[in-house]
Curated annotation (Swiss-Prot):
Keywords: NADP, One-carbon metabolism, Oxidoreductase. Pathway: Cofactor biosynthesis; tetrahydrofolate biosynthesis; 5,6,7,8-tetrahydrofolate from 7,8-dihydrofolate: step 1/1. Residues 2-157 form the DHFR domain. Signal peptide: none annotated. It catalyses: (6S)-5,6,7,8-tetrahydrofolate + NADP(+) = 7,8-dihydrofolate + NADPH + H(+). PANTHER family: DIHYDROFOLATE REDUCTASE. Its EC number is 1.5.1.3. NADP(+) binds at residues 7-8, 15-20, 44-47, 63-66, 93-98. InterPro entries: DHFR (IPR012259), DHFR-like_dom_sf (IPR024072), DHFR_CS (IPR017925), DHFR_dom (IPR001796). This is Dihydrofolate reductase. Key enzyme in folate metabolism. Catalyzes an essential reaction for de novo glycine and purine synthesis, and for DNA precursor synthesis. It comes from Staphylococcus aureus (strain MSSA476).
Length: 159
């Protein structure tokens, strides 16, 4: 099993505001699709509800304490330990509580750094490059649909 974080955050580590992304960046959505298609996304219930439906062509797993939660096309787990039973490449997809719980346990992180400061009420936990090696850093292309500077980072935990 490979365990990765997949997240976009701004320069203040904001990941959300009122259960929505504070920015619109189609490049990042394509990046998420490219990385996670054919694999497993694990997210909390609030993150799933902000998306509104299972993402196609990948396994969608929702971690929730709500034993009555049931959505077609979604597998439900009720504990962090259940994540370790999932096969293949598993991406931790948010939100804040799940990221806080898993950041010290993942092998690597795929981070889209949004080069701006946005209003937010949900944050990615602090991390330092002392703990992570930069495997790749690619500037996102700007165009009429992608107007916010952004960088795609792949960080691997230092041994």
């Amino acid at each position: 099993m490979t365990l990765s974080i997949l997240v976009a955050h701004d320069l203040q580590r904001v990941i959300g505001f009122e259960n929505q992304l504070p920015w619109h960046l189609p490049n990042d959505l394509k990046h998420v699709k490219k990385l996670s298609t054919g694999h497993t996304l694990v997210m909390g219930r609030k993150t799933f509800e902000s998306i509104g439906k299972p993402l196609p062509n990948r396994r969608n797993v929702v971690l929730t304490s709500d034993t009555s939660f049931n959505v077609v096309g979604v597998d439900v787990i009720h504990s962090i330990e259940d994540i370790y039973q999932l096969p293949g490449h598993v991406f931790i997809f948010g939100g804040q509580i799940l990221f806080e719980e898993m950041i010290d346990k993942v092998d690597d992180m795929y981070i889209t750094v949004i080069e701006g400061k946005f209003r937010g009420d949900t944050f990615f936990p602090p991390y330092t490059f002392e703990d992570w090696e930069v495997a790749s850093s690619v500037e996102g292309k700007l165009d009429e649909k992608n107007t916010i500077p952004h960088t795609f980072l792949h960080l691997i935990r230092k041994k």
